[in-house]
Amino acid sequence: MPSSKPPSSQRPAAPEAPELIWLRPERTGRGPKPAHSRTSIAAAAVEIADAEGLEAVSMRRVAAALGAGTMSLYNYVPKKEHLLDLMLDAAVAEYDYAALAPTGDCRADLARLGHQQLGLCRRHPWLPALVISRPGIGPNALRYTDHFLAVTAPTGLGGGARMEAMALFNGFICQYAQYEQSAAAGAKWQTELVGYLARAAMSGEYPHLAQAFATSGPPGDPDTAFDRALDRVITAILAPPTPR
């Protein structure tokens, strides 16, 4: 009896799987009750990255940490980029929103948020690179976005302007954290950098740099320097937009 199925060339193509991990089901494939979850996989990856850096994270390493076969994890996390997105969202779940409840004082609220974010970046040194390079659209990242919009609502800025302000805010803190990491990892590099810039300032080729060096005091406490820089960023966020 001839088959009732149409030739393969006439069958509709299977729908393409969503690229975003957040649009995919928690687990694909049939079989017994899942032994793992995205949460446990992300937690294992975060632990590896905290101990050894982001470059040490691989599906093989995560599988070994969970006592699972590498290929079995692809039922939960189809590719490395998805794992990075899960790690980012797992880390930003650590915000203490009870301590960050908006008070109506935007400057104070943003300062508290900035200090929590810097603490998060210090606990997870790999996090700044992901915040800058990956879209923060997981459920925990969206909660952070919603909180930032709530904190900045009293400014009267539109939603688009406040989203731009959030990008500025996050970018500053992540880059500050990365600079801290570089300085801590290479004391010799830091000493050479200061000496190099001092010689450049004294060369006569950079008069404004020379003036800045002449009128600047010693670096001082890193946390105090962060407070000053964060306050400038917050001032920029709260400033009325320039008429165009």
Which residues does each PLM region occupy?
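A structured, mid-to-C-terminal "fold-capping" secondary-structure block
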Residues: 2, 188-244
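Short, hydrophobic secondary-structure boundary micro-motifs
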Residues: 129-131, 185, 209
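Hydrophobic alpha-helical bundle segments that form small-molecule/ligand-binding pockets
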Residues: 144-195, 237-244
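Hydrophobic alpha-helical segments that drive targeting, anchoring, or assembly
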Residues: 62, 140-144
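Helix-turn-helix
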Residues: 40, 44, 48-81, 86
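Hydrophobic alpha-helical connector segments
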Residues: 98-140, 160, 169
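N-terminal intrinsically disordered/low-complexity leader segments
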Residues: 1-35, 207-216
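Alpha-helical structural segments
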Residues: 40-47, 82-98, 109-116, 143-147
